[in-house]
Curated annotation (Swiss-Prot):
Catalyzes the attachment of serine to tRNA(Ser). Is also able to aminoacylate tRNA(Sec) with serine, to form the misacylated tRNA L-seryl-tRNA(Sec), which will be further converted into selenocysteinyl-tRNA(Sec). It is an enzyme of class 6 (ligase). ATP binds at R261, S262, E263, E348, I349, S350, S351. HAMAP family: Ser_tRNA_synth_type1. GO terms for biological process: selenocysteine biosynthetic process; seryl-tRNA aminoacylation. It catalyses: tRNA(Ser) + L-serine + ATP = L-seryl-tRNA(Ser) + AMP + diphosphate + H(+); tRNA(Sec) + L-serine + ATP = L-seryl-tRNA(Sec) + AMP + diphosphate + H(+). It comes from Streptococcus pneumoniae serotype 4 (strain ATCC BAA-334 / TIGR4). GO terms for molecular function: ATP binding; catalytic activity, acting on a protein; serine-tRNA ligase activity; transferase activity. This is Serine--tRNA ligase. Homodimer. The tRNA molecule binds across the dimer. Consists of two distinct domains, a catalytic core and a N-terminal extension that is involved in tRNA binding. Belongs to the class-II aminoacyl-tRNA synthetase family. Type-1 seryl-tRNA synthetase subfamily.
Length: 424
């Protein structure tokens, strides 16, 4: 959520920044006018309350003097009626302001590339060289079916489109991947957490999914509960409405969880395979940091995600997302895109973002600065470390052999009982 004071005092700069995210200046102007009206009403209310207090004191004095108080009582009643009417108007204005501030995206950092969409993203670096095959590489969905480790047909029968069963070494591979990821992040100082997979609406508001993106989620009917779209939600809300000790920052959390997404608006995209599912496993990283340290922590988090891909020897690239392609809550985002041979393209496998104080303001996560003792909003960061299903897809395609088998990456073999190959 944006700071209304920043919009008020630095309006032109904020409007210019948000314009790069598709926010019409007219919306901000309307918000500014409503805020000005609110402040004027507040002044009137305080003035009227002061007058009412004065009249109340005069009435008390008049009664002590046994004087007639009818006129003063009538005046106080009129003042109270005016205050009540203005309070009602103020409540309506506050509701409008809340609607504005909760649906506007975060202000992009100065270092974010300006652009309309993913075509304006900027490649930062690459790692590894895509493998050259001396045979036609298969898509991971065909490999998975031929190996008998991925079953979309029965997933569709039991549930519906974009669901599947992992079987045998496929299930073992999925489990090996996320255990490996959690172990690697643990080495980097992340505390492993098992979170609830169901959260309440306040938690969804805190991280920015609600109210703007309700259609992308799975709500439990007639309840206050939602299936988590990512472990970012419970991990970030762990400290909601709390004040942390500044000396304890930064704090690192990691968790593996299922993620549930309706994929509204994704009809026709990635209809086959593991790239876009309604339910998938993901290892998440979340950080709580002081404002002056958060961008250094973003670079470290991105490196933590890269470490997984490097140890799995999967070629990838890092791109800085443009203002038009970033997520709602992000001030800056790096995407990691892994090489998918059958698509001859890089596809997103991780997204690492600094939300600055955007989520912290919504969730009221603060810290007490040990230097001056003041309570301040901290910065929150989140990143995939990594999407597990997409990692399975990348391994199947990059490690496939001409005979249809798939070599298991060396880093995962200790997690798979020493198995080296998945064979038909």
């Amino acid at each position: 959520m944006l700071d209304i004071k920043r919009i008020r005092t630095d309006f032109e700069a904020v409007a210019e920044k948000l314009a790069t995210r598709g926010v019409d200046a007219a919306v901000l102007n309307e918000m500014k006018e409503i805020d000005a009206k609110r402040r004027n009403i507040l002044v009137k209310v305080e003035t009227l309350k002061a007058e009412r207090n004065t009249v109340s004191a005069e009435i008390a004095q008049a009664k002590r003097n046994k004087e007639n108080t009818d006129d003063k009582i009538a005046a106080m009643q009129n003042l109270s009626a005016e205050v009540k009417a203005l309070d009602a108007e103020l409540a309506e204005i506050d509701a409008k302001l809340t609607e504005f501030t909760t649906t506007l995206p975060n202000i992009p950092a100065d270092s974010v590339p300006v652009g309309a969409d993913e075509d304006d993203n900027v490649e930062v670096r690459r790692w590894g060289t895509p493998r050259e095959f001396d045979f036609e590489p298969k898509a991971h969905w065909d490999l998975g079916e031929d190996l008998g480790i991925l079953d979309w047909e029965r997933g569709g029968k039991v549930t519906g489109a974009r669901f599947l069963f992992y079987k045998g070494l496929g299930a073992r591979l999925e489990r090996a991947i996320y255990n490996f990821m959690l172990d690697e992040h643990g080495k980097e100082g992340y505390t492993e957490v098992i979170t609830p997979y169901i959260v309440n609406h306040d938690s969804m508001f805190g991280t920015g999914q609600y109210p703007k993106f309700k259609e992308d989620t799975f709500e439990l009917s007639d309840t206050n509960f939602v299936l988590i779209p990512t472990a970012e939600v419970p991990l970030t809300n762990y400290y909601r409405d709390e004040i942390l000790d500044g000396k304890d920052l930064p704090i690192y959390f990691t968790a593996m969880s299922p993620s549930f997404r309706s994929e509204a608006g994704s009809a026709g995209r990635d209809t086959r395979g593991l790239i876009r599912l309604h339910q998938f496993h993901k290892v998440e990283m979340v950080k709580f940091a002081k404002p002056e340290e958060s961008y250094e922590e973003l670079e470290k988090m991105t490196a933590n995600a890269e470490n997984i891909l490097q140890k799995l020897n999967l070629p990838y690239r890092v791109v800085a997302l443009s203002t038009g392609d970033m997520g709602f809550s992000a001030a800056k985002t790096y995407d990691l895109e892994v090489w998918i041979p059958a698509q001859n393209n890089y596809r997103e496998i991780s997204s690492c973002s600094n939300t600055e104080d955007f989520q912290a303001r919504r969730a009221q996560i603060r810290y007490r600065d040990e230097a001056d003792g003041k309570v301040k909003l901290l910065h929150t960061l989140n990143g995939s470390g990594l999407a597990v299903g997409r990692t399975v897809a990348a391994i199947l395609e990059n490690y496939q052999n001409e005979d249809g088998s798939v070599t298991i990456p060396e880093a995962l073999r200790p997690y798979m009982g020493g198995a080296e190959v998945i064979k038909p």
